[in-house]
From Swiss-Prot:
Gene Ontology cellular component terms for the protein in this record: extracellular region
Tissue: Expressed by the venom duct.
Propeptide section residues: 1-16
Cystine pairs: 21-33, 22-31, 27-34
Domain notes: The cysteine framework is III (CC-C-C-CC).
Protein's recorded name: Conotoxin PnMLKMF-01
Organism superkingdom: Eukaryota
A GO term, aspect molecular function: toxin activity
Family that this chain belongs to: Belongs to the conotoxin M superfamily.
Amino acid sequence: DDNPGGASGKFMNVLKGQPLCCPFGGCHELCHCCGS
């Protein structure tokens, strides 16, 4: 579900303004590039 009203949209709304570190140190639209 990529529609704004789906779970993904709500998830992005929750993380908006407070991005987290990517769990695998990679880059993603929902998290920062942390680590090496």
